[in-house]
A protein has these predicted regions:
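ATP-dependent carboxylate/acyl-activation modules
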Residues: 1-133
Length: 133
């Protein structure tokens, strides 16, 4: 199975730019190899921060954006599994993240999507999860 992003769907009104898409693909590949609950923040095909092994996604997101610091502005964020609540997206947005990739499929996907849309961000759904427990 080769995941190149061709089958991903855009859940938001705004589609990613070419640079954002490259960063989303890079972050997704990194998240795939990190212990769950994995969150990766990346920009210019460089990992800026990661959160892993936490009991929930929002704690992983907090770790990732803290490591990225000010460089998170305009960055991409990848989650190795679905984002069950909008809090993970809100943490990313609060630190300047403007592009998200996640499997999708959460009961509350519409809330996460609306949060990203409201901030002018883009969000892609892969349809594939990567758990490393």
């Amino acid at each position: 199975l080769v995941e190149d992003g061709d089958a991903w769907t855009c859940a938001t009104a705004r589609k990613p730019t070419d640079d954002e898409l490259a960063d989303l693909k890079f972050a997704w590949k990194c998240a795939k190899l990190i212990k769950s609950n994995a969150i990766v923040v990346a920009k210019n095909r460089t990992m800026l921060g990661m959160g892993a092994g936490q009991p929930n996604r929002v704690n992983s997101a907090r770790l990732a954006v803290a490591q990225a610091g000010a460089a998170a502005e305009g960055a991409a964020l990848a989650s190795d599994a679905l984002v069950p609540f909008l809090d993970t997206i809100a943490v990313g947005l609060a630190h300047g993240v403007r592009a998200f990739v996640q499997p999708g499929g959460a009961v509350r996907d519409d809330e996460s999507t609306a949060t990203a849309d409201g901030a002018g961000a883009t969000m892609l759904h892969t349809g594939v999860r990567h758990f490393r427990h």
